[in-house]
């Protein structure tokens, strides 16, 4: 039987892609290992809940990976139904409940795989709310469980340190002055850098993250999608902290390569634009805006007078939350598409982000600060404007702006709304100012460092090799 590593990704698209790319990376450098990826699959007639999590949209991606990388095996596992009394939760938190209720199904799948292969390790996405002991207790041999942290070392430091600061957050939660929080290896942060769901330390989300931190501390190791050159202080703090028992394996940047997706004419349009002249605006698979915010973005782009390629989700979010898809003409200011057709391109719903960022014409990126997107921009040397929307993205913004210094931050009001003037000013500053040039030079150096980390003898390659050696010896 072949030595097998089982990867168990979260339902979210960004988490799935990152885990699949980790599997590809392992196979590239350690082909003697076999990779099986567990995929939670909704019932034949999916509920609105599971549809919200875009399980169906992942099917096309999985089919593409199966066709292009047949050495990766996908093992489908039934997704458990949620109890009727489950509270309303945003998608990234809802996925926690779905995985938690699917623990028994995952355990059965692992028992099935163990009969046909030699399981050497199980790698679980940190956002899968499963107790590793419950998953592995019925396996004949002691299979080590590792956690894959799909974001960076800085947010991992916050997560693992959160149980330490949580009592203070509760004690100070009603004070008017913002609490200054010092996490080892990071700049000083405040509660404003936390995910929106964690502003109240007594919230459901905070209780979940406390449990996740506790669970991760019991793993055999934590695999992190980062590299030393961009988060040196955070990595050092985690590695040297005696209170963080699991060894750290920084194997990044683990990013997706363009794999022949339909480009909707984006690349042909970019071919006609001058070098480093276009700003890409793309906000991830869950990045939806209200009608008012979309119009404000459009006005801001006109004010910036820059070339742009804007990916617009036609399902509204925010105050206008709706699954109904509207036309671009219904969503954008009257005449906007006609007025900007010489300088801009607007694409509905989706575009091949990795391929676009790698194009010579792209010189800036307005991003939601999802970590996969940040790493893709770093690997292509594209400077950023940071506009976080959900999950850990506000913390990522702090890292991008203060620690890495590869982005400008947009300032939103207390409701999260960004004005056209603010967006237009930040885009123009990125593309035309001396500060923008400094950021461009800095991120180009990080691009070189990313390549070095992944090359033979690099820090990330060394971490991967060390990890694979442990697996083979287990």
Curated annotation (Swiss-Prot):
Impact upon substituting residue 15 to A: No effect on catalytic activity
Q: What family does this chain come from, according to its entry?
A: Belongs to the UDP-glycosyltransferase family.
| Outcome (variant: residue 359 to A) | No effect on catalytic activity
Consequence of substituting residue 456 to A: No effect on catalytic activity
Catalyzed reaction equations: a 7-hydroxyisoflavone + UDP-alpha-D-glucose = a 7-hydroxyisoflavone 7-O-beta-D-glucoside + UDP + H(+)
- Tell me, how does this one assemble? Monomer.
Keyword Nucleotide-binding (UniProt): no
Q: What does this protein do?
A: Involved in the biosynthesis of isoflavonoids. Specific for UDP-glucose. Can use genistein > daidzein > formononetin > quercetin > kaempferol > 4,2',4',6'-tetrahydroxychalcone > apigenin > aureusidin > esculetin > naringenin as substrates, but not cyanidin, trans-p-coumaric acid, caffeic acid, benzoic acid, m- and p-hydroxybenzoic acids, salicylic acid, salicyl alcohol, and hydroquinone.
Give the pH dependence: Optimum pH is 8.5.
For this protein, what is any one GO molecular function term? glycosyltransferase activity
Q: What is the effect of changing residue 125 to A?
A: No effect on catalytic activity
Give the record's note on temperature dependence. Optimum temperature is 45 degrees Celsius.
Q: Which residues bind UDP-alpha-D-glucose?
A: 150, 351, 353, 368, 371-373, 376, 392-393
Q: What is this protein called?
A: Isoflavone 7-O-glucosyltransferase 1
Where an anthocyanidin is bound, by residue?
A: 15, 391
Q: Which residues form the active site?
A: 15 (proton acceptor), 125 (charge relay)
Propeptide ranges are 1-49
What changing residue 368 to A does, per the record, is: No effect on catalytic activity
> What InterPro entries does this protein's entry cite?
UDP-glycosyltransf_plant, UDP_glucos_trans, UDP_glycos_trans_CS
What are the EC numbers? Answer: 2.4.1.170
Q: In which tissues is it expressed?
A: Expressed in shoots, leaves, cotyledons, epicotyls, hypocotyls, roots, pods, seeds and flowers.
Q: Is Transferase among this UniProt entry's keywords?
A: yes
